Amino acid sequence: MKDKLELVPVSLKEANEFVRRYHRHHKPVTGHKFSVAAAVNGEIVGVAIVGRPVSRYLDDGWTLEVNRLCTDGTRNACSFLYSACWRCAKNMGYKKLITYILKEENGASLKASGWKCIGEAGGERWTGKRRPEVDLYPAQMKLKFEIE
């Protein structure tokens, strides 16, 4: 089949460049445990960047977080990447993988790949000393999803 999605390795630099070009509301990340890409006919159509959980309370050594997932809109690329991320994390010995989406998003690709919605998470904005002067991301509640 000519237009089949394929999993391909990708460097953090390449994944971040894809995020810079295509992500609706996030910027590239500074580090990762691994990144993967989805390709069709050798052309990258989506990337996922997986790292340690942003929340230090969830950073237990057994949990990773999909920090960025971004596609060009290719059908089924999101669920393909979420499934691939879980297979990779599980094969590395991790017990849980988490991610967050905006509350306005429906999570269909996560549900299609076996993830469960845990509920609302976080606040609308950053708080504390690290809060940027200008909001870097949409001021909305997030939904937390996980798979184990």
Please identify what each model-predicted range represents.
Residues 4, 63, 142:
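A residue-level signal for beta-strand positions that form part of recognition/binding surfaces
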Residues 1-29:
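Short amphipathic alpha-helix that is part of the acyltransferase structural core
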Residues 140-148:
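Charged phosphate-binding loop/patch that engages nucleotide di/tri-phosphates or the phosphate backbone
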Residues 46-47:
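Short glycine-/small-residue motifs
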Residues 9, 33, 39-40, 51-139:
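Acyl-donor binding region in acyl/amide transferases
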